[in-house]
A protein has these predicted regions:
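Short amphipathic alpha-helical segments
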Residues: 14-37, 72-75
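Glycine-rich beta-strand-turn "strand-cap" elements at beta-sheet edges
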Residues: 38-50, 76-94
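Short, well-ordered beta-strand segments in beta-rich or mixed alpha/beta enzyme
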Residues: 2-9, 39-68
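Generic structural motif
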Residues: 11-13, 94
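Absolute protein N-terminus
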Residues: 1-2, 94
Length: 94
């Protein structure tokens, strides 16, 4: 299993807009329906709604790599450009 922790730092006021646009566009549902996706969940920091944490779990690194290449992830990258200043990713194979 592959576990990813992705910390997004948004522009002021952008954290909630980022997650809302991903949800409203259907991207979140599309990712969760992908082969090998165990979970894909966004959380907000208690201190700042502009700090967003994404926890992803995948059956295998190969399935997560296929996810990155999907059309809806290209759309997510466009949304990310509007709202996100910095992204930090940590991966662990369990």
């Amino acid at each position: 299993m592959l576990l990813l922790s992705v910390k997004y730092t948004a522009r002021p006021g952008g954290g909630e807009k980022f997650v809302r646009e991903i949800t409203d566009s259907g991207i979140l549902d599309a990712v969760r329906a992908e082969d090998g996706c165990i979970s894909y969940d966004y959380f907000f920091s208690a201190e700042s709604r502009d700090t967003v944490l994404l926890i992803e779990k995948w059956v295998s690194p190969e399935q997560q790599e296929a996810h990155i290449q999907s059309a809806h992830m290209a759309e997510l990258m466009k949304i990310k450009e509007k709202y996100i200043l910095n992204t930090a990713v940590e991966k662990a194979v369990l």
